[in-house]
Amino acid sequence: MADKPKRPLSAYMLWLNSARESIKRENPDFKVTEVAKKGGELWRGLKDKSEWEAKAATAKQNYIRALQEYERNGGGGDDKGKKRKGAAPKKGAGKKSKKGAHSDDDGDSE
């Protein structure tokens, strides 16, 4: 059985993937985080995002179709061998207080 389809990229991520190289070329000393930050600034300033929003909508429709096909073929129904997010116990959950935990006597001195 095929793997579950990956979620589609947002309009911003589609745009950033296409603009990343030009941002790097203009700012060769930028780190990955700085490229993303600059990309965010440029995206906010972008007047016409319709091209990227249309591409994102198409990608979302393709994802929905692929996901339905995946589920029709029996994917996603059973979680055998897969851990769910949030299934791990929270840090400190189930721990008992150390106060008096190692004490063998009940306070009686005989």
From Swiss-Prot:
List where Basic residues composition bias occurs: 82-100
GO MF entry, a single one = DNA binding
Q: What is its main location?
A: nucleus
Q: Which GO terms describe its biological process?
A: regulation of transcription by RNA polymerase II
Where along the sequence lies the DNA-binding region? 5-71
Instruction: Locate the region Disordered.
Output: 71-110
Q: What does this protein do?
A: Found in condensed chromomeres. Binds preferentially to AT-rich DNA.
Regarding protein family, the annotation reads: Belongs to the HMGB family.
Please report the name of this protein according to its UniProt entry. Answer: Mobility group protein 1B
Which gene is annotated as encoding this protein in its UniProt record?
HMG1B
